[in-house]
Amino acid sequence: MALLTALDDTLPEEAQGPGRRMILLSTPSQSDALRACFERNLYPGIATKEELAQGIDIPEPRVQIWFQNERSCQLRQHRRQSRPWPGRRDPQKGRRKRTAITGSQTALLLRAFEKDRFPGIAAREELARETGLPESRIQIWFQNRRARHRGQSGRAPTQASIRCNAAPIG
């Protein structure tokens, strides 16, 4: 079995109380088995972790934590070496820049929103021409605006929602 020891033996006895985590000191063979499994799969399933834990005589939650810590260490190493992390997008590409919307663009969009909370593609393209913003950003602006103003006046409720909200008969 792996040895469990206090996180820091140099702490006074009262600081090493029952709330302190124990660290896992694994044998070389346990470390080799953990590392071999990690090299095959950075995110093994619960069944794999349970099987590994049983095979090397370490509690499964400790195996889970070992994998989390190992992934964290690997990610830090990749960042230091500025290599892309497997499965992540290219760090040079990153996210799309945030679109800055001016006061006049906002005013125009608000007027359009008051007229129609669900503009069609033609109306959005016209707004795009008027504001100079891409149509896709106009669409997202309307989605966000509707989400912020949920429950306020908008489209008339559908027959289904009227039936669902009606008082019980009887």
From Swiss-Prot:
It is found in: Nucleus. PROSITE patterns: HOMEOBOX_1 (PS00027), HOMEOBOX_2 (PS50071). Residues 19-78, 94-153 bind DNA. Pfam families: Homeodomain. One of its GO terms (molecular function) is DNA-binding transcription activator activity, RNA polymerase II-specific. Residues 75-100 are annotated as: Disordered. One of its GO terms (cellular component) is nucleus. Disulfide bonds: none annotated. It comes from the Eukaryota. Expressed in rhabdomyosarcoma TE671 cells as well as in several other normal and cancer cells. GO terms for biological process: positive regulation of transcription by RNA polymerase II; regulation of transcription by RNA polymerase II. InterPro entries: HD, Homeobox_CS, Homeobox_regulator, Homeodomain-like_sf, HTH_motif. Probable transcription activator. Binds the P5 DNA element sequence 5'-GATCTGAGTCTAATTGAGAATTACTGTAC-3'. Belongs to the paired homeobox family. DUX genes are present in 3.3-kilobase elements, a tandem repeat family scattered in the genome found on the short arms of all acrocentric chromosomes as well as on several other chromosomes. This is Double homeobox protein 1. It comes from Homo sapiens (Human). The lineage of its organism: Eukaryota, Metazoa, Chordata, Craniata, Vertebrata. The gene is DUX1.
